[in-house]
């Protein structure tokens, strides 16, 4: 199974922002038990890019045979190259940057950039994107997603940001092929309190909402 197929298997990408070392490993382990098969480790703008790369390498080494590991919030060529060197299998950005998209494909990685308008979505695909994140989906809403999706049925469109247990099924029915979910899965309060088992149950709840 190739990287994109792994991601699309159930469509959920769990997004880790600001978790490292033991907390990250424990959280990912439980989310995998809950059925999650794709993880995104985000670069923190103004943060330590090397630390993000180390987290990607750590996850790839421990869980690479079970799931797809990617890098998120990739905004610069140096971050792209660092993510590739760290072992990232796919690259996610919040924006439509033709240079990043083309650079990602030149490295043989899956490209999933962010976009908000039909023009941006088509521009991303024309540049080589394998799929596109509609971002921020929660703020834009289900009706907006449907309206954008209707004239672009052949494009793989993810719903990212603001996706939760209350609306994920609606986005699925609206035509989303996948979902980027951060704090609802990487719940900071539960992780800080060491309640990692709860993450497994939350993951299962999300999958149940979309028929898994």
Predicted regions and their residues:
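Short helix-capping segments at alpha-helix termini
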Residues: 34, 61-67, 152-154
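Conserved, mostly hydrophobic/aromatic
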Residues: 14, 31, 83, 124, ...
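Active-site mouth loops of central-metabolism enzymes
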Residues: 7-23, 67-72, 109-114, 155-158, ...
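Catalytic domains of carbohydrate-active enzymes, especially glycoside hydrolases
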Residues: 29-39
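Structural motif
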Residues: 34, 86, 107, 127, ...
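Short acidic/polar active-site loop segments enriched in Thr and Asp
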Residues: 37, 89, 130, 177
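Active-site-adjacent beta->alpha loops and helix N-cap segments on the catalytic face
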Residues: 2-3, 20-23, 43-61, 77-81, ...
